């Protein structure tokens, strides 16, 4: 489901891992990215994980991949403070205390298509550990 190629990784120092770290799956999208910015601005270390490598690259360059009022300046500030970064490496969830999933579930005639959601959890379980 997620590409194996790593385009950019600017991981947190080991000291910060799990202390107050949140991983947002679907983090480069219209829900995950603004949520990540809000959490990082409140002091959390945020890892945005997404399969959209184009958006990951744009975010890590300090730009938003879509228009979100006031977010461009905040994103640059949070990247400078090393409070947020984006990657396509799903195994980054191991560094987080909390995981938030923001992936799409398209609806077809009033029925959600859960195929991507279910497949994602099969991929995710390989990276989860006890505690």
Where are these regions (language model features)?
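Structural/interface elements that position substrates and couple domains in central-metabolism enzymes
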Residues: 2-131
